[in-house]
């Protein structure tokens, strides 16, 4: 009789443990080339990166002493093909803080693999940014939400079941070291992808400015088609309050890099089956433009006071 076969099952992370004293990750060649190209145009070192969603790109006009770096002069930088998304980085100050605005984010439905979606974020991090404020336009699933409201993201559903992996960093060990170092210093309120304390402060600041906000869970789908009625019912059952086609890849990568994350969705429309109108991208842009005053007020106050 053959001896029994014993199986060893590992429940650990897929990476070997990395000492906390491991050297800092160095950018991969593609990222290093992009950093060099930006540094030829500005020596600005941002503290905060703001990624702007559909119809919200003109928030970058709020930057003081701006330096604009077009996406097409940055090697390896993905180019957006979506109306309302003009690809460029805008460096400057906002309420006295050093910032960089990412205008013209790219989406999975434009044909980019998930790791490419996070290249602009990784570039900003390599230039010095340690905090991410990300905005998007989303369809409202929660029946108490109305178009034009602003929702702070407290969690997400990754319905694309995709992950940026290691992005453009040098090796899995480097990113694992960053993740482990961040986890070792994270507070109990910062064990998720979104900084709940930053969110609490931001919502308080919004109330002070007279900007009413809500909180909720954001569902990411690949697009480009809007969701069917059946899909919206499914997402509602799963706990989603809003749905959109962006944000989650950047948030996942920001977390891996140890960045603090604050997410804001502009509810631009009722999701399919909850309203009577046919969903069009132009409508998303229109509502985004209508609410940009509130969002501008909110973002400036958040940058100044949190």
Give the positions of each predicted feature.
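Active-site rim beta-loop-alpha module in soluble metabolic enzymes
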Residues: 192-234
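Short acidic/polar active-site loop segments enriched in Thr and Asp
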Residues: 130, 241, 260
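Zn-dependent metallopeptidase/amidohydrolase metal-coordination segment
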Residues: 245-283
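Metabolite-binding pocket within alpha/beta catalytic cores that recognizes anionic/polar moieties
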Residues: 21-190
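Generic non-transmembrane alpha-helical segments
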Residues: 37, 41, 197, 201-211, ...
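His/Asp/Glu-rich mid-to-C-terminal helical/loop segments that flank catalytic regions of hydrolases
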Residues: 271-306
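Non-catalytic positions within long, well-ordered alpha-helices that form the structural scaffold/packing
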Residues: 125-128, 236, 255
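N-terminal amphipathic/basic-hydrophobic helices that include classical n-h-c signal peptides
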Residues: 1-19
């Amino acid at each position: 009789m053959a001896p029994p076969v014993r199986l060893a099952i590992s429940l650990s992370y897929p990476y070997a443990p990395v000492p906390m004293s491991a050297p800092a990750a160095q950018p991969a060649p593609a990222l290093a080339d992009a950093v060099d190209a930006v540094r030829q145009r500005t020596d600005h070192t941002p503290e905060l990166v703001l990624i702007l969603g559909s119809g919200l790109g003109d928030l970058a006009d709020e930057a003081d002493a701006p330096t604009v770096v077009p996406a097409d002069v940055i090697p390896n930088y993905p180019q957006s093909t979506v109306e309302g998304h003009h690809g460029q980085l805008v460096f400057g100050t906002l309420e006295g803080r050093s910032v960089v605005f990412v205008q013209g984010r790219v989406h999975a439905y434009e044909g980019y693999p998930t790791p490419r979606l996070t290249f602009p974020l990784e570039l900003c991090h390599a230039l010095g940014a340690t905090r991410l404020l990300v905005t998007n336009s989303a369809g409202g699933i929660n029946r108490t939400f109305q178009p034009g409201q602003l929702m702070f993201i407290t969690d997400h559903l990754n319905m694309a079941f995709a992950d940026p992996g290691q992005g453009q960093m040098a090796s899995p060990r480097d990113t694992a070291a960053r993740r482990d170092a961040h986890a070792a210093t994270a507070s109990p309120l910062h064990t998720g992808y979104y900084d709940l304390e930053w969110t609490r402060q931001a919502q308080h600041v919004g109330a002070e400015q007279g900007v009413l906000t809500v909180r909720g869970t954001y569902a990411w789908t690949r697009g480009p088609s809007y969701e069917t009625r059946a899909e919206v019912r499914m997402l509602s059952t799963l706990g989603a309050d809003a749905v959109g086609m962006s944000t989650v890849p950047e948030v996942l990568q920001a977390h891996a890099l140890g960045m603090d994350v604050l997410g804001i969705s502009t509810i631009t429309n009722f999701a399919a089956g909850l309203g009577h109108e046919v969903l069009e991208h132009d409508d998303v842009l229109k509502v985004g433009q209508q609410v940009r005053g509130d969002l501008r007020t909110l973002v400036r106050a958040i940058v100044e006071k949190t």
